Amino acid sequence: MTSKSLPTRTTLSSGTFYQIYPPSFADSNKDGIGDFRGIISRLDYLSDLGITGIWLNACFDSPFKDGGYDVRDYTKVASRYGTHEDLVELFHQAHARGIAIILDLVPGHTSEQHLWFQQSAASEYTDFDDRYIWTSHAFEGGAGLAFIGGEHPRNGAYIINFFKSQPALNYGFAELTQPWHQPVDAPGPRANQDAMVEIMKYWLSQGADGFRVDMADSLVKNDGTSKRATIGIWQSMLSQVRAEFPNAIFVSEWGTPTQAFEAGFDADFYLDWRGNGYNLLARNTDTPLERRNDASFFNSDSATGAQEFLDMYLPQWERTHEAGLFSFISGNHDCPRLAPRLNEQERALFFLFQLTMPGLPFIYYGDEIGLPYAEIPTKEGGYARTGSRTPMCWDSQLPNGGFSLGNAPLYLPMTDTSQNVAQQRERADSLSHHVQKLIQLRSQLPALDGFADLEFDLSLLKKHPKVMVYRRTHHGGDSVLIALNAGNKPIRVEFQQPQAHELFRCGDVAYPDLSDHSVVELGPTSGVILSV
């Protein structure tokens, strides 16, 4: 193991992050559930892949009615993943390999079993009365907000964010329209802000490098589309944390970069479920297993072109590219996986795109080997999302695909072992090696830095709607050209760059004149990176 420099806020942009769903990555104690020690045992794999950061999904103490996103104690780890010391050791071992770890922070709600809520729900007055949002009496609804009434001694109904088990923390209301609405600077909302600041400081002091913040844009209710009050709260909280931990990394689940970066976040996810066009690329479907109904751009059989996505993406990038990292994801625990809807060549082309675009790319565990979505029963509130959370497959020759060497029932069934790390390591042309090479290029070429300039050639789209051609340039210096054909027919692309030099190819790529790379012929589902 060689020591590598740890990414910080100022060096994030050349790296690649990897999302781990803890119960499904690696099981060290043979109980069928992934854990911190299991992740430690696989850090060398991530280091070899070129990963510079890990986003660790919710791992705090929880009754797991929503996969851990119903937190019972923010300063205690979930015992099924190990001990506090195990998590600290994970920080240490990751840092020794130059890998940062950001934890999942869920600031908008807690579990109904959290001590704060238990005290807030009591019939007698406590200091926690206003830490959650309660209506004036048990028979009063939420005035447009989801609510639960009649389950606790307190005479009121409480507002929930998602499930009944997730009471919303009170950060106030931007518009006060009900007697029980409180302003953002009321004592209850202020106490919640202070508590979140202390929670972040605590985990940073334990060795965490930052946080991915769940539903970061949804703290203040009635905040409209501008999110002015929520932005102000984050500016206050993050400035307090950074006064003590200036290198702390903050990534938001916001999906509106103009707002997220103003709020103080370093990176913001480009989310499928926002109305921003990202779903058009690889998840333009309601049937995660059926290719026939998939209208994604990277499905070579679909008619979907690049123009609609670019019309929505480029204005956002132009407004925000100097302020933060608008980040493409391969997937996550809440959305369908790329496989099996997209075949391996299409997934390879998707990664060529993702890893050459601006921002800070996030790879969901297993996507680099083609781990498929599985149609399985719901687990811990996952419902349709459960199929994207199945165990990582390490070696098909080992019990349980190497995820767990014990006999205990697995957290989720391993439905397919055909795509596994061991098999892909043996194939020089595997998806895993393809991703590894792209990550290496991204880390080595300043022109592929997350903050490097971006310029799309839109002239080809009318004739070839499933083609993308774009240039990345590092501050007026080195440039690379990327051309990709997501369609099922070959095309010819001409550049005004006779001295272009090929750096990487995906699929069938040919040059009519071998001494001149200014004209390239791209086969179906193919792409190329050229140095110019």
Spans of features found by a protein language model:
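Acidic/aromatic-lined carbohydrate-recognition and catalytic surfaces
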Residues: 2-191, 205, 216-263
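Beta-strand-rich binding/interaction modules
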Residues: 489-509
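Short, solvent-exposed loop/turn segments at secondary-structure junctions
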Residues: 23-25, 60-62, 107-108, 209, ...
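An active-site-proximal structural segment forming one wall of the substrate-binding cleft
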Residues: 189-211
